[in-house]
Amino acid sequence: GSLESRWASEKMVQVLGFDIFSILVNFWRVLLTEPQKLYEEASKLSLSDYDTIKEQLLSWNKSQALFVGWHTNHYARNPIELDPIIGAAYYFFNHNLSYGPQYLGWLSSIYTPKKWEDMCYKLRNYRNPSLIVEESSFEKVIEAHPNDVLYLDPPYFLEESEDNKMFKGLYPNGNFAVHHNSFDHEKLRDLLHSHKGRFVLSYNDCEEIRNYYEGFEFYFPEWAYSYGQGETRVGKNKQEIGNTPKASHEILIVKN
């Protein structure tokens, strides 16, 4: 995430970053080790390639692994392999130009060839020698680093309650939130209550989460979400929460 990468690049703090989403991890590994090659591959792509690249990504064996046991065959494809650099370039292209953004989303109308060119140029100049990114689950990471300072950004807690404004999983896509819907929030709570080191935990603010982490410090930042900015439709869930989906409803939970 952006916070961890800034710690590493600006403060020169050694940061180990972990995520369960193998496609995101592949992107970061390539960006950290082969930024020039990643730039060269990404800069070959144009907005008119979006649908073709999306289909290639969907067929990627890493993507197909997401849909093992999925309830329909809508996303099923004959698996293909992609070179890690190509896969990273395709991921960057698809994610950054999509509405949301989200993985395997649809092309947003706000992007132009010039904006895409500017995005690619940032790849070329990226350097962050203090950051290492690996694929792992939160259970393994927390247990392997019992005394370290942790920053955690888990999927939103979705169980219905009077003050919970989140009602749909988003990771890696709202239509197949496989990493979101299966997340074990109680396991995370139990591990963090036993963690010896300090931590900062970012969550959606609701009574259940506040109860989970009673006794820790709470902070309530304010900002506006960019996801779906400009959307005017109001569904039943938004009506029930006051139709303020852009207003922040985050809580930072801190153990010092």
Give residue spans per PLM region.
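Class I S-adenosyl-L-methionine
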Residues: 1-16, 29, 120, 124-127, 136-149, 157-256
